[in-house]
């Protein structure tokens, strides 16, 4: 009898330990972000925050160089993106990129002895990434505001950013008895180790799939086309948001009504633009580089590395806690004439997008 009691006690203890293994131990800090008593709180684990702070520090910028004198494209050959800078500022920008992206490898990571040579794929990719950065800093200010981004925002001293994603490998169904997992039930890290669909990125950050699944009526109306699988993918994406930014649901949503834009936090509109920015960058910049990258840089299905929220945020609600690095590097915005042309071309799209978060149907989840 005593042995049975001991075994039962041990079983209960082991089960309890297993159930609590995924929980954070107290204490945690709560920051009120809405009206009292409504649960609008931001939960912060001070121990996790202490570990994160050193990784979110922006490097000190060197003083901006003299902008007088000949332009870089007048002195150097094959300077296609940063040619509008002075020679001094161009040299400063190149030194900064080396420190941000390849501090160990140095200039040779992208260049041969002939600096004008484009034989290294790294140089071709970096040129396109500079154009991408310039676009983000001028045409996606609804998401990055005046803070902008630099190469360091994503790379953090690594030639390949740590936080990237590839299309998930399809299930190998060589034997019918294993069943069809339907892209979920794998406890993937990207969806918080849950059974949710483990590739929400292809659906929402590459394809133009609507994230909206939340209803605003007590009973079904028959007008919603969302099904359970789409709802699960949406929640998978939300789990990614939470981990990527180190926040809980109430950072963007009012839990009184997830579908309400009027009662949501301002960050929800910022996230709405962020979703569309990620799609733009993945489809118009990353996908076009698929054939440029060597095979060992591609994913298991042969696709190119792509961007999600973690690529920039890396666990912080604002990348580098909002450090304004871009303002110190004029080369990370296009030449004035090109910037003006881009702004005029993008104006109709931006005008329509500006109204979208508040003017569309109130069933949006993000």
Swiss-Prot record:
Binds 4 heme groups per subunit. Keywords: Electron transport, Heme, Iron, Lipoprotein, Membrane, Metal-binding, Palmitate, Photosynthesis, Reaction center, Repeat, Signal, Transport. The keyword Lipoprotein applies. It holds the Pfam family CytoC_RC. It is found in: Cellular chromatophore membrane. Heme 4 binds at residues 143, 309, 312-313. InterPro entries: Multihaem_cyt_PRC_cyt_su-like, Multihaem_cyt_sf, Photosyn_RC_cyt_c-su. A lipid is attached at residue 23 (N-palmitoyl cysteine). A lipid is attached at residue 23 (S-diacylglycerol cysteine). Heme 3 binds at residues 238, 249, 252-253. SUPFAM superfamilies: Multiheme cytochromes. Heme 2 binds at residues 129, 151, 154-155. Residues 1-22 form the signal peptide. CDD domains: CytoC_RC. Heme 1 binds at residues 94, 107, 110-111. Its main location: membrane. One of its GO terms (cellular component) is plasma membrane-derived chromatophore membrane. It is a lipid-anchor. GO terms for molecular function: electron transfer activity; heme binding; iron ion binding. The reaction center of purple bacteria contains a tightly bound cytochrome molecule which re-reduces the photo oxidized primary electron donor. Component of the photosynthetic reaction center composed of protein subunits L (PufL), M (PufM), H (PuhA) and cytochrome C (PufC). The reaction center interacts with light-harvesting antenna complex LH1. This is Photosynthetic reaction center cytochrome c subunit. It comes from Rubrivivax gelatinosus (strain NBRC 100245 / IL144). The lineage of its organism: Bacteria, Pseudomonadati, Pseudomonadota, Betaproteobacteria, Burkholderiales.
